[in-house]
Amino acid sequence: MSNRVIIFDTTLRDGEQALAASLTVKEKLQIALSLERLGVDVMEVGFPVSSPGDFNSVQTIANTVKNSRVCALARALEKDIDAAAQSLSVADQFRIHTFISTSTIHVESKLKRSFDQVLEMAVGAVKYARRFTDDVEFSCEDAGRTPIDNLCRMVEEAIKAGARTINIPDTVGYTIPSEFGGIIETLFNRVPNIDQAIISVHCHDDLGLSVANSITAVQQGARQIECTVNGIGERAGNCSLEEIAMILSTRKDSLGLETGINAKEIHRTSNLVSQLCNMPVQANKAIVGANAFTHSSGIHQDGMLKSQNTYEIMTPESIGLHRNNLNMTSRSGRHVIKHRMEEMGYGNKDYDMDTLYEAFLQLADKKGQVFDYDLEALAFMEAQVDEEADYKLAQLVVHSDSTEGNATATVKLEIDGKTVTEAATGNGPVDAAYNAIARASQCEVNITSYKLSAKGEGQNALGQVDIEANYNEQSFHGVGLATDVVEASVQALVHVMNLTSRADKVADCKEKIQKDRSELGGV
């Protein structure tokens, strides 16, 4: 049996399901390209039948990514499989991942069918998917709670139908390692054609055991692990890609297994996903948390000064976290910025040098010295920029009375090419600025969440504002980044307004299409 473990990343499918607001196609593509550089073997990038937006993002990624196999999810229904195949058809090689529930509670309560009927649907779905590609993966949803006799039967029949990968999910994170490892061991012992497929596992983290269960599974013969960057996903999340990659690398002496992951891309990819998904990484998170390589105890610090191996089983450099002694100021040339970006793992196609350097100079003039985390933040923010924005902030002036708490703000907005100026008061400068923008734009959004975080250290650190807002029963996520908190707050709101404007245009297009169809007699 091969010692190579296939890494199947589902950040853009299962991971995105945990987000309060969906990612844009541009943001998904940026993450997909980062995953490609990270070296994932397969990336599951969406559920095409679920929406035109998901279909479009899958198609865009499939047309762009070349070094990782792109996969789309489909229920055991022909319409789902058709949508997946159509969205993926632009790729040279692709995978269709079809699934159906197999546990008793799912079969009886959710599907309201007999197990034999579900088995027939599964076999039919695999055979239908094989019409489009030889690379078909089949998942037994809630396999962790499926009676073992039924699971063995389902796996055997799916392989006979043509599935080349069989995925065994612990969908609700219920099993413990001894149980889950036992399931994989039983499949290898009892399914006669098991050698004709790769066994995959997809473990959720409801009991905090997703990584442990996945490692136990590969010890029993599974050779694909499904995971997400930073472990994001439904409920408590998924198996963490970075933890799996570094466990298999650091403990190769014990496990004897390896992956194709370029570990030096882990830190950069983790930061990118955290930023674009608006999901901060907890400080004590294994591998990528801010404290993962921090030593506070005097005894630990003394040991580290004598030898890093005393308290570090891996180095920061091994995951691409570089110690930087290069000071970047407004006197730094473009070559310095380009060199630093390359050291942090960014390629030329990840950012526009002209845009980044202009933003760098503006920031350097404000705060003097610019650090790695500043450059990363500026690079990430490129994905938030909409070149065809309907709303642009031209000017912001704020006057605040610190004793009374009242403030006045004047904003100048460019709206569809026209300049509009409005002033308003409010309970603090941010409230005043938001009131002025509401007057100027006549765009009514309901802000449901406001988060402020520092990107860096000291009084001149960049401030990032993340807001979530409801508009026409949809949720939107806006981001702003500036050394001034009020400016960052305004940027975030303007970002949301541009997203809502785009949503209105999409709705108008849909309405026109429906009207045209109606006039043509429903054709």
Swiss-Prot record:
- Outline the segment boundaries, as ranges, of region: Regulatory domain: 392-523
E.C. number: 2.3.3.13
Q: Establish whether keyword Transmembrane is in the entry.
A: no
- Domain Pyruvate carboxyltransferase stretches: 5-267
What InterPro entries has UniProt attached to this entry?
2-IPM_HCS-like, 2-isopropylmalate_synth_dimer, AIPM/Hcit_synth_CS, Aldolase_TIM, LeuA/HCS_post-cat, LeuA_allosteric_dom_sf, LeuA_bact_synth, PYR_CT
GO cellular component, alphabetical, reads:
cytosol
Query: Its GO biological process terms?
Result: L-leucine biosynthetic process
Main localization of the protein?
A: cytoplasm
Cell compartments where the protein resides:
Cytoplasm
| Gene3D superfamilies (alphabetical) | 1.10.238.260, 3.30.160.270, Aldolase class I
Residues at which Mn(2+) binds? 14, 202, 204, 238
Arranged from A to Z, the UniProt key words for this protein are: Amino-acid biosynthesis, Branched-chain amino acid biosynthesis, Cytoplasm, Leucine biosynthesis, Manganese, Metal-binding, Transferase
User: PROSITE patterns from the xrefs?
Assistant: AIPM_HOMOCIT_SYNTH_1, AIPM_HOMOCIT_SYNTH_2, PYR_CT
Any one Gene Ontology molecular-function term assigned to this protein's record? manganese ion binding
Q: Indicate the quaternary assembly.
A: Homodimer.
Q: Which family does it belong to?
A: Belongs to the alpha-IPM synthase/homocitrate synthase family. LeuA type 1 subfamily.
Q: What is this protein called?
A: 2-isopropylmalate synthase
Species for this entry: Shewanella sediminis (strain HAW-EB3)
Q: What is the lineage of its organism?
A: Bacteria, Pseudomonadati, Pseudomonadota, Gammaproteobacteria, Alteromonadales
